[in-house]
Amino acid sequence: HVSEAFSEDPVRILRVARFSAKLCDFRIAEETMALMTLMVENGEADALVPERIWAEVSRGFASRHPLNMIDALSRCGFPVDPDNSAMREVLSKAVSEDLCLDARFALMTAFCRNAEEAQQTAANLRTPVALQQLCSCFRTLLPLFAEAVDAQTAGALLERGDALRRPERMALMIRMWEVLSQKNVEKLLKASELWCGVNAGAVAKAQTNPRLIPAAVRAARIEALQPLFAASEKAGNHGHDGSQ
């Protein structure tokens, strides 16, 4: 329950929702929810300073029950998330796997209907630029994650994901894919290490034509992945031969 003074500061909408994420038994009184809804409908939430929005929402996403916060904000009309049961299951899994705040949020936006909706969701909650980039990158990589079954396709994934310059972010996205797909990703994590471990300088020195260096370095990285995927490729070929 709250007093009439509650409506004087719209950040309290977010704070109440955050409490529901932090405290499992926290319940929002119907009168309070009605007041929160009225404040959103009257446009009072539009005046919130961006930093204050994310300060509250981020703490809720990092809590043990972020879905409770999402539900509370959705009930009062504050634009938050795609209404998707699969998203709820994945976000719960991300919490149980103790994935970080950024991973949880990016996984939620992966269920938006399109890139524009995902961008709007991030904008509504005033997310930092780095997190918006993570959301966009992960969404773009989803088809490549699904196709990464051999050295060539895994290499394409790591290349597009900028594993060389952003190895920590790549590892995080691989873990996010594990939660989303429920597949074992240890091979992809190892592939990322091998990809980044190639001595590009040594490969470049061995080339007499400078224009061939980029292709040679990429080929060396693909070659480094071959042994990792060789066993599964061989098993797949045997299965194909036996079906003829």
Regions from the PLM with identified roles:
Residues 1-123:
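Glycine- and charge-enriched loop/helix tracts that form the active or gating conduit
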Residues 36-50, 95-97, 122-135, 141-144, ...:
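Short, mixed-charge aromatic SLiMs
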